[in-house]
């Protein structure tokens, strides 16, 4: 059964690519779909200018600019990117709004999150989280439930800036994840835009946690912690 993850906002293509690679190594069939108006996710994937109404292979995962007719039967997980355009016609099992904490004004992104929050849908609530030290030490007993959609705030010192952001915009901490990024994240992000081999061993532990959380949610009851650690390490090396 296909699980649909909807992503709004920006600055998330590296998160989607890394997570898709890990899930592929776990034996899942994954498709990345860019339904944004400016096709910004497409720019992170080489050699696909003008791709329309077809599915191509990228690093063992599928990529398309629209939802294939056979998606429900052909894939386990779909990461669907919509940019800044809210699409109430698509039901997502999980919904995310991603923003950069270094934006001059976060108000437009918070307003987008509020629009998504107002949509009438019934997402799954249970998500699994890794320990704070990253994917090397996964605690199977650590889990939490939150209300969707999830607001993801990324950037340098995002965790320390979160309290100010929450105070300014009345953001509910239960549905928000603040994730610190550093120079290693930026290097890997630039690399995945231009290199055909995507490696991400230099990313921050907070970002590894975010990948782990997304992957565990997609895997659900099928996850195997030992195999997941191997799949994560393999994906980090670009395999």
In which residue ranges do the predicted regions lie?
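A short, Lys/Arg-enriched amphipathic alpha-helix followed by its capping loop at the start of a domain
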Residues: 19-28
